[in-house]
Amino acid sequence: MKYVGAHVSASGGLANAAIRAAEIEATAFALFTKNQRQWRAAPLSDETIAEFKAACEKYHFGPGQILPHDSYLINLGHPVEEALEKSRDAFIDEMTRCQQLGLTLLNFHPGSHLQQIPEEECLARIAESINIALAKTEGVTAVIENTAGQGSNLGFKFEHLAAIIDGVEDKSRVGVCIDTCHAFAAGYDLRSAEACEKTFAAFERIVGFQYLRGMHLNDAKSAFGSRVDRHHSLGEGNIGHDCFSWIMQDSRFDGIPLILETINPDIWAEEIAWLRAQQIAEVA
């Protein structure tokens, strides 16, 4: 079964994220459990936790259908020790919040070397950051998102994801989320069913579908291989419709959150309905 939704706002209370997801007839959703542009947040109250769990139960969202995202400030591969520790502490807090909310996944951008340390050292720092967080939490899987490769961000090659996973001690609690816009911008072609087959064959060979815990379904304003992260509405960008039809018809993408981060929230309900319809359509 395909779980399809969008990254919805938790404004006014975390429970509202589940309500907003239900309003667009989603069967999955993503959210921030705190302000994504601040380091600190007040601890979750018992009331907030209870309200969130009740809303998820009411609208039939299980933990495997929800893909929380951490703060954009966190850099688990930071070259400077003091800044690295700050990021690690913040990541542990994000994992703990997920644990308190009964969630089992936490999606994050791997990190950046800031042109100060070699790629290999940065990847090793990211893996060690994950190890530290997993040791201090329970039941939550760290889900590494591939990146477009802007600036000094790592994670734009499948090999980066594989290297991080290789350094994580508890393989049962690490996974990946593939963002289609990021992959396309990083040089993985998705413009046809044939291109998708080739790209995901490479993913299977290098990373493995057993680690796929979620997807971000985004078209791309940015050009192929541009290393620029610019999302677009489905079918309106440089990837086109075929990729998303192909994903909806492939059982390897069953049972994980498929999350829209497309640029027009007003048409998320339409995009979700279109994606569902592709399950019985044929790629042209």
Curated annotation (Swiss-Prot):
InterPro entries listed in its UniProt record: AP_endonuc_2, AP_endonuc_F2_Zn_BS, Xyl_isomerase-like_sf, Xyl_isomerase-like_TIM-brl
GO biological process: base-excision repair
Entry similarity comment: Belongs to the AP endonuclease 2 family.
Positions with a binding annotation for Zn(2+) 1: H69, H109, E145
Single GO molecular function: phosphoric diester hydrolase activity
Annotated HAMAP family: Nfo
Chain positions recorded as Zn(2+) 3 binding sites: H182, D229, H231
Name assigned to this protein: Probable endonuclease 4
Matches recorded under NCBIfam families: nfo, PRK01060.1-4
Cofactor: binding comment: Binds 3 Zn(2+) ions.
The keyword Zinc is assigned to this record: yes
Cofactor: Zn(2+)
Enzymatic reactions: Endonucleolytic cleavage to 5'-phosphooligonucleotide end-products
EC code(s) of this entry: 3.1.21.2
Keyword tags: DNA damage, DNA repair, Endonuclease, Hydrolase, Metal-binding, Nuclease, Zinc
Organism superkingdom: Bacteria
Binding site for Zn(2+) 2: E145, D179, H216, E261
Keyword DNA damage: yes
Role description: Endonuclease IV plays a role in DNA repair. It cleaves phosphodiester bonds at apurinic or apyrimidinic (AP) sites, generating a 3'-hydroxyl group and a 5'-terminal sugar phosphate.
Native species: Klebsiella pneumoniae subsp. pneumoniae (strain ATCC 700721 / MGH 78578)
Cited Pfam families: AP_endonuc_2 (PF01261)
